[in-house]
Regions:
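P-loop NTP-binding core
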Residues: 1-288
Length: 288
């Protein structure tokens, strides 16, 4: 099982959008690869951000009809991390309605906007295994999933460290703006620290330029600078596009919002689907 942490200590860099669309791309790819009588591999999305935007998208979107999970107030990722739910994780996981065109092979663990703010303190108060709670949850679901994609909170917290400790791979979305690029150093230092102290198997896959607007000369210069410094670690840039925002609001990934004409194809003529498909393929190849 490959566990991909979408990580950056800076907020507003596109972590949630990256998480949803990479997960959808992986699910669609495995659906297309599976034979007619074969079960495709499965993807699990985990939302560790207190804003719970990934979970909102997977549950119907900001403006859509929110789907009810039928679970109690602690039967979610917060309750699992704080050990406040009596249910096993396999009873809490729900199947996402997206991506359309896949064979219902993307799941998510429900989150809780009310409970998530309490999780970091609970983890911090457990000096023995507070950094390893998520790893334990992931070990439980390992037989069922090929990919797990984790949306992380901004800042450096026990939640984000849990994510890195439990992951096999990590990618850093980064806007082509000075504050975001300056924050890369901190993010890379955190990853290296976790690799040394807690998780030597964690592999850094690269930097994902996100929400790019190449009409601005400054952004072209920043991208050239990143290529000069990090070379092959720079992934295909994702442009800022209205369709991506509209898709999030409707509770859809970009591949469902702008689907391909043929059900066995991932990309449509829409540029956003093409960019995310290229990034997903790059990341999948780097994960092996």
């Amino acid at each position: 099982m490959k566990v991909l942490s979408v990580f950056n200590q800076k907020g507003g860099v596109g972590k949630t959008t990256t998480t949803i669309n990479l997960g959808a791309a992986f699910a669609l790819m495995m659906s297309h690869e599976a034979g007619a009588n074969e079960e495709p591999g499965r993807v699990l999305i985990i939302d560790l951000d207190q804003q719970t935007h990934s979970e909102i998208t997977l549950s119907g979107g900001f403006f859509g009809q929110r789907r009810q999970t039928g679970l109690g107030p602690y039967d979610n990722i917060a309750g699992l991390l704080m050990m406040d739910t009596a249910l096993p994780v396999t009873d809490i996981i729900r199947t996402s309605e997206i991506p359309h065109g896949a064979r219902r092979n993307m799941d998510f663990i429900p989150s809780s906007k009310e409970k998530m703010p309490n999780v970091d303190t609970a983890l911090k108060n457990d000096p023995i295994d507070g950094l390893f709670r998520l790893r334990g949850i992931l070990e439980t679901v390992e037989p069922f999933y090929q990919y797990v994609v984790i949306d992380n909170p901004p800042g450096l917290s026990y939640l984000s460290i849990n994510s890195l400790v439990g992951s096999t791979h990590v990618v850093i979305p980064c806007q082509l703006e000075a504050p975001s690029i300056e924050g890369l150093t901190s993010a890379l230092k955190t990853i290296q620290s976790v690799q040394r102290q807690h998780n030597p198997r964690l592999q850094f896959l690269g930097i994902l330029p996100s929400m790019c607007d190449f009409r601005q000369q400054e952004q072209n210069e920043f991208l050239a600078s990143l290529h000069g410094q990090y070379n092959s670690l720079i992934l295909t840039p994702i442009s800022r596009r209205a369709d991506v925002s509209y898709a999030n609001s409707e509770g859809l990934d970009i591949f469902s919002f702008k689907p391909a004409r043929r059900s066995d194809q991932l990309m449509s003529a829409n540029p956003a689907t093409q960019e995310f498909a290229r990034v997903a393929e790059e990341i999948r190849q780097r994960m092996g």
